[in-house]
Amino acid sequence: MTPLRIVVGADDAGYAYKEALKADLAADARVVEVVDVGVGADATTPYPDVAHAAAEMVADGRADRALLVCGTGLGMAIAANKVPGIRAVTAHDSFSVERSVLSNNAQVLALGQRVVGLELARRLVREWLGYEFDPASASAAKVALIDELDRRGADSGAQAGPTTTTTTCGS
């Protein structure tokens, strides 16, 4: 596995975990670079700005993955997913972390400081670093479909999807 370039970010609700996880990442031999996009100890930058900055670094190739922390991890994942080409997930258990990479090729992991303990967060990040998506896997075609939906949305501004039919029940 090629050493990873990781970008980290948090809002004020995830600052303490971000700092601990950033130190763990910097000490991990699988990581060659850690870039912190905020927040600082006394900052209150809104999480969408932090998530967007981190996701942009992944999308444009300046980082391989991003680790984001807020209160729940949910807002960070939602905001990061607004960047074309990004697949961000919130995961608070080992199986979800594993499948996020192996099945979905997610490049962004969002954690919630108010949801999991620090030692579990540390374990999940260590596990996350060990997974690498296999472009020849059975999941590759599904990930390619996700990428195609992303491109179609970016190109046309319209949502693509299946045809739907509405039926009214009763009279």
Residue ranges and their predicted role:
Residues 4-16, 94-171:
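C-terminal binding/interaction regions
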